[in-house]
Amino acid sequence: MGKQPIDLLMQPSWRIIDQSSLGPYFDAKQSFAMDDTLCASVGKGESPATARSWVHHRTIVLGIQDTRLPFLEDGVKLLEDEGYRVIVRNSGGLAVVLDEGVLNISLIFEDEKKGIDIDRGYEAMTELVRRMLRPHHAEIEAYEIKGSYCPGSYDLSIGGRKFAGISQRRLRGGTAVQIYLCADKSGSERADLIRRFYQAALKDKSNDTKGVYPDIRPETMASLSELLRTDITVQDLMLALLTELKELSGRLYAAGLSPEEEMVFEKNLTRMLERNEKVFGTQESLD
């Protein structure tokens, strides 16, 4: 019998880093630097498998492809005028919306020993979300939702409407599988914001000669609260996450960064700041 998605979730212990309630001053650049740091320490066997939860207030995270938009400045201005911070992550993919109603989860595994092929990481995250939402008896499907923002083959949807997207980053012997879960508020309003961003940054669809940027239809996206017709909060999802990981492992324990990880984190954060300065031309500090 081949390896199952659940095998990857069944760890002897899970290290938990909960950054879901740090508030509006927690910058998303810190999150991407954090996951790169954890990839390195988990990849070297210095840390067990780690689950990190994170929430960022009113932030648009662009992918590297988005930085090539012909009128990027106009798109960024539109987002900033709506009260959003805009950052560029250190990986591919396209723009996503983060706010206080979106829970992000990163699962960081050691790559080499587990022989994680790309699909297996995605499938493990999909399995985890299905387990988290079991009490709601919803049929969760994983396939690309055309018309959504940052579409991919592991978009998670209920009844054809997307509520989550999964990405993966491999670095220094570690793999970070990342998901955003839209808990509450309006999924279509989030999608409409990204639709207007691309409209401003492209001006004309003919400027997208390679067909890279999605033609967003806001009605393809929804939050879990909308789809399940009940109030689902970030806190509800956090509790479900911890409950499932506890069932799947020998022990859970909370641990911040070690002194060695702190040093690596500072270097990774500097790289993120430099990347963003290169794109947006403004120097910043997160002290």
UniProtKB/Swiss-Prot annotation:
Picking any one GO biological process from the record gives: protein modification process
Domain of life, per lineage: Bacteria
Residue stretches making up the BPL/LPL catalytic domain: 45-253
What's the EC number here? 2.3.1.204
Matches recorded under Pfam families: LplA-B_cat
UniProt key word Endoplasmic reticulum: no
Miscellaneous note of the record: The reaction proceeds via a thioester-linked acyl-enzyme intermediate.
What's this protein's name?
A: Octanoyl-[GcvH]:protein N-octanoyltransferase
**Higher taxonomy:** Bacteria, Bacillati, Bacillota, Bacilli, Bacillales
